[in-house]
Design a protein with these regions (language model features):
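Metzincin-family zinc-dependent endopeptidase catalytic domain
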Residues: 1-95
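Metalloprotease/metallohydrolase-associated module, dominated by Zn2+-dependent proteases
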Residues: 61-70, 89-185
Length: 185
């Protein structure tokens, strides 16, 4: 996507890197002051059976490993939440083509974008809702970031805030000890 700032058009580029740090501790996460750092625990089990971030514009969350298969858009979708993007309110987008990145699971789409193209639209027991692998980042997603309102220094702007929440492995805590996340999938 592109954005226009002070009558100049720029190509939007997100540089995303990752590292595996199984021994990272809560204090290191809580004390983070680098806006480039995001913290996501990735585990086999998640209470609620879904990946999530801790809130809009945050920098931490919890991913269910099953959601991160090759071709999955879950990480990009959750990253959108960390940048402050909401789920759209109209969740029946039949006739509107390819779903944008921020549409959640359960969105009603044209058959070719469903888990099961033969299922009745909206039948979430038989695959009649959007398969997340079909979501794409679209120019309108970039516009929703309102990048033209950021303060830029040396060509860089900061999008999002710090939540810096350390998450325990959900397999080690009961569902009553689990704090319900603010933003789902």
């Amino acid at each position: 996507g592109k954005v226009t700032i002070e009558n100049e058009q720029y190509q939007v580029v997100f540089k995303i890197t990752s590292s595996f740090q199984p021994a990272i501790g809560a204090i290191e996460i809580y004390e983070n002051v680098n806006p480039a750092n995001n913290y996501f625990r990735i585990e086999e089990f998640a209470h609620g059976n879904i990946s999530f971030v801790d809130g809009l514009g945050c920098n931490s969350g919890y991913f269910k490993l099953e959601n991160l298969y090759r071709g999955s858009t879950t990480a990009a979708h959750e990253y959108g939440h960390t940048l402050g993007l909401h789920h759209p309110t109209d969740l029946d987008i039949r006739g509107k083509g390819l779903p944008a990145i921020m549409y959640p699971r359960g969105t009603i789409v044209d058959p070719q974008y469903q888990y099961n193209p033969e299922a009745r639209a909206g039948d979430n027991t038989n695959g009649g809702t959007m398969h997340p692998m079909y979501r794409k980042v679209k120019p309108e997603d970039i516009l929703l970031l309102k990048l033209h309102k950021l303060d830029f220094e040396n060509g860089k702007g900061i999008v999002g805030e710090f939540s810096s929440v350390w998450h325990p492995d959900h397999a080690d805590i009961s569902s009553t000890d689990y704090m319900q996340p603010g933003i789902f999938g």
